[in-house]
Amino acid sequence: GELGADPSRVAVIAATGAKLLAHHLAGSKIKGVDRGLQAGDVIKVGRSVELECLDTPGHTMCHICLRSHTDAPALFSGDTLFNAGAGNCHNGGDPAALYATFVEQLAKLPGNTQVYPGHDYIENNLKFTLAREPDNAAAQDLLPQVIGQDPAHGRVTTLAQEKEFNAFFRLASPSLIATLRKSFPELPEQPDAKTVFVKLRELRNKW
């Protein structure tokens, strides 16, 4: 659909004079884009905030994340990276592209980067991790702390923490692979990381 025609977005633009920024290839889907964004572009907000655009395909093929460069770096990860999870690929996305985004971009960001996703699915995502990797101590510890949390005041995680309890970063875990092979017996004993990621995403679609 034409996302730019969303009534609430139109109202905000009308009331504030804000500019509509989107992925440079999203013009056919989003009406009225003022500026197309590419990897490396910088968005300035006020006098002190600068956000770097990351081109992060997978959830859709026109998805961007925003990275702030401060003493406490942050990643506004939209529907690409969730706390303890990864975005779906139902809207024209591709799990293989999402895997590449995780491995080639997100995993290489500083460990102290705080993660601010577009939705709060942390409770369900941690339950998925524990279904796939039952001995994950970090997920076991965090789950009771986030059950029923108010999304407006939710737990903020870092990328270093995500690598401890987010199944989509834990592609070499022996426990996770052993459990995965029960769902997909055709997998070899040591499947490659991309295959593990894609199969996890397939299972998460039905979770």
Locate each region found by the language model:
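Histidine-centered catalytic micro-motifs
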Residues: 1-5, 54-62, 116-122
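Core dinuclear metal-dependent hydrolase active-site scaffold
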Residues: 42-71, 105-108
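Conserved beta-strand hairpin/beta-sheet module of binuclear metal-dependent hydrolase folds
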Residues: 65-78, 84
